[in-house]
């Protein structure tokens, strides 16, 4: 059984991680454990590089907390220009898989608050009245009227980040081209 450490305690992220690992390896073969670790980036990462760094840092911290695990998973949401998205980073002892989620253009009413230094989740709570929205459907759930959620969008990106761990083509050694 694979011991998978999710570098988060956010229920929406843990559910996405659970769904992805279950899809790839089977529910009976995975045990998911969430741990609270720091991303090492601001609460609201800005830009792809800062956001991916946050996901990688989460994996690094989770590895320190649970070194005996088989997989470590970091998910970090961020904003780039006018869009929200997230980076997924999955590692085992010898491989790393990464993927970026789909992006959602945010309305100016939200972006204004972010430019003033507030977090997307806080702005969404302020505008919708939904407490702790980032642990639920998130901005994606609100703007798609529930057709998508943080969990569903992250699930898809996590499946892509898992590809190097199960697709045999990724294990084929590189052969030098013959002149």
Curated annotation (Swiss-Prot):
Residues that, per the record, bind Mg(2+): 38, 68
Protease keyword on record: no
One example of a Gene Ontology biological process annotation: thiamine metabolic process
GO molecular function: ITPase activity; metal ion binding; nucleotide binding; ribonucleoside triphosphate phosphatase activity
Reported cofactor(s): Mg(2+); Mn(2+)
Residues annotated for substrate binding in this entry: 8-13, 68-69
Reaction(s) catalysed by this chain's protein: XTP + H2O = XDP + phosphate + H(+); ITP + H2O = IDP + phosphate + H(+)
Keyword terms, alphabetized: Hydrolase, Magnesium, Manganese, Metal-binding, Nucleotide metabolism, Nucleotide-binding
EC number: 3.6.1.73
Cofactor binding summary note: Binds 1 divalent metal cation per subunit; can use either Mg(2+) or Mn(2+).
InterPro entries to which the protein is assigned, alphabetical: ITPase-like_fam (IPR029001), Non_canon_purine_NTPase (IPR002786), NTPase/PRRC1 (IPR026533), YjjX_NTPase (IPR050299)
PANTHER family (UniProt xref): NON-CANONICAL PURINE NTP PHOSPHATASE_PRRC1 DOMAIN-CONTAINING PROTEIN, PTHR34699
Quaternary structure and interacting proteins, as annotated: Homodimer.
Biological role stated in the UniProt entry: Phosphatase that hydrolyzes non-canonical purine nucleotides such as XTP and ITP to their respective diphosphate derivatives. Probably excludes non-canonical purines from DNA/RNA precursor pool, thus preventing their incorporation into DNA/RNA and avoiding chromosomal lesions.
Family the UniProt entry places it in: Belongs to the YjjX NTPase family.
Protein name: Inosine/xanthosine triphosphatase
Organism: Pectobacterium carotovorum subsp. carotovorum (strain PC1)
């Amino acid at each position: 059984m694979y011991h998978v450490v999710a570098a988060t305690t956010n229920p929406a992220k843990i559910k996405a991680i659970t769904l992805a690992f279950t899809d790839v390896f089977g529910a009976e073969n995975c045990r998911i454990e969430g741990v609270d670790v720091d991303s090492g980036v601001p609460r609201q990462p800005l830009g792809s590089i800062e956001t991916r760094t946050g996901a990688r840092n989460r994996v690094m911290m989770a590895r320190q907390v649970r070194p005996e695990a088989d997989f470590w998973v970091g998910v970090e949401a961020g904003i780039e220009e006018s869009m929200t998205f997230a980076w997924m980073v999955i590692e085992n002892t010898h491989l790393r898989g990464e993927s970026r989620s789909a992006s959602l253009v945010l309305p100016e009413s939200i972006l204004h608050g972010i430019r003033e230094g507030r977090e997307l989740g806080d702005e969404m709570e302020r505008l919708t009245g939904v407490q702790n929205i980032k642990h639920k459907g998130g901005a994606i759930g609100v703007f798609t009227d529930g057709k998508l959620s943080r969990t569903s969008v992250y699930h898809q990106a996590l499946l892509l980040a898992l590809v190097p761990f199960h697709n045999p083509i990724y294990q084929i050694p590189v052969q030098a081209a013959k002149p």
